[in-house]
Amino acid sequence: ALPLWTFAQEKLDEFNPVQYAIISQTISPDARGASLGDAGAATDPDVNSQHWNPAKYPFTISRADVALNYTPWLRQLVNDIDQAYLAGYYRIGEHSAVSGSLRYFSLGEVQTSDADNAMTVNPYEMAIDASYSLMLSEKFSIAATLRWIYSDLRYDYTSEDNSPASAFAADLSAYYQTYPTIGSRECQLAFGLNISNIGSKITFSGSDAAEFLPTNLRLGTSLMVPIDEYNKFSIALDANKFLVPTPPTMEQYTKETGLSDSQGYDQWVHEHYNNTSSISGIFKSFSDSPEGFKGEMKEIQWSVGAEYTYNDKFSLRAGYHHQDPSQGNMKYFTVGAGFKMSVFSLDAGYVIATAKTNPLDQTLRLSLSFDMDGIKDLLHRR
C-alpha cells in the first residue's frame, strides 16, 4: 500500500519520503482526534485512546466504553475506499484497564481477470489490537499493546505465489497528567508518548524485499483550562516521526562510491536499506537523512488542536496538521463537533485541505460511542 506521496508539490530531487507498508495504520480512525488536527497523545482520555495512547485508559471516568468509527477515505479520488474501527476498554479496579480494537480498511472493488474470466476482487487490510494499561501513580500510567496485522492486496488469485501478508507488532506508551493552578483556576496539564508498530517487517507476494511497518513515535502535550463551572477550553500539540529509515538517494550512492550507474545503485540500496532490520531501522531513522539534522526535522509531522466543551455534553473542535513537502505535503485544517446524550456520544470531523489537489480534502469521519457503565445503571433503574 502506498502512502499519498504522489501528491507532494516539491521538486523531484527534493522529494524523498519515508516509505512503509500498511497505510491503514497511519489513518486517524475517530472523529475527535481527527478534528484536532490528528492530535491525541495527551488529550483527555476517551474510548478511542487505543489508537492515540492506550496508557490514558486508567484515567477515564466511565468504567467501560465501546465505540464504532467510520471514515470514507479519498472520496476526492474514488467512492468505495473506507475504514471501520471498533474500539473498547474496561477498567479493572481503579488502577488498570484492558482495551482492544479492530480496524478494517477496504480498498473497494477492483476489476481484474484470469486467463478465462473477468472477476471482481476486494483487497483490504485489517488489524486486531489488545492492550493492558496500568497506573503507576495518581499522575502516571503506562501501557503495552500487541497487534496482529493482515493485508490481502491480491489482484491476481490465479498465481500460487500470490498470498496475503501478515505481521505482528507492539506498542509502548506512557501518559502523565498534573493539575497546576493558573491564576485562580486549577487546570489539567498532560504529556503523552506512544511508540507504535514495533515489529517484524512484512513481505508481499511478488516482492523481493520485506517492507517496513509504519513504526511511529508520537509525543504530545495538552492543557485544559476551565472557564467556569460549565465551560472549559483545551489545546493539544503532537509531534510524529516515523521510526523508519530514509530511502538512500542516488546522490548518496555517488558520494560514497564515486559511481552513478543504476544497477550498482540498486545493489547498494539492497545492501544499505532493504537488508536493514526493523529494529536497526528504528535507530537509523534518527540520523540517516541525506540532509542531516535539517532533513530529520522535516520528517516530523505536527498536529495542533483546540477543543471547547460545554457541560461535558457539547464540544466544538478545530485543528491543523502539517507535513513537510519533502515527505508528502499533507497540510490541512480540521473541524468537528461532538454531542453526548445520556449513555451515547456522537462525534463528527471534517478535513479542509490547504490545496484542492490534496486527496484528503473534505474527508468526513463519524464516531458513535456507548457508555457501558451508563447503560448498566439505566437498566438497573428499570
Where are the regions that the model predicts?
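Sec/Tat signal peptide C-region and signal peptidase I cleavage site
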Residues: 4-8
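Subset of outer-membrane beta-barrel
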Residues: 9-382
